Amino acid sequence: DYLSGDKGNGDKFKAFDPLYGTHHKFYGSMDYFYANLFVDGYAPGLMDSRIGVRFRASDKVDMEMNYHYFTTAVKLPDLKRSLGSEVDYQINWSVMKDVKLSAGYSFMRGTKTMDVVKGGNHRSWQDWGWVSLNINPRVFFTKW
């Protein structure tokens, strides 16, 4: 995925921000690039190179792993383009009809450029895990 960016040295603002975009779906589960993309007036855009694999272990269990390599879309003065890498893992289990249990784990390794344009400390370990129980009963049904 590619979101154009702005070098910040002109009179016009040229960065693209997908209003109401589904950032979580496309830019990693950790949501580093979700709402307010960057800090301190930076708007370098985003380039996400992603590779993933999905494996169906059985009729009821599937797993997915994705690797994201994030860079800025434009070269900023005195900064490298690399923002960091993220790995996302998710497992889904269809417990019964209309009930699914999902769990996931993600971690991110940022760079010095990430510190400047997003804030934070790239040397600290960034990770999170989650568990979700989804119940989707069919309440109303009609045949026409």
Predicted regions and their residues:
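Extracellular/periplasmic loop regions
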Residues: 1-54, 116
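Outer-membrane beta-barrel "beta-signal"
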Residues: 123-144
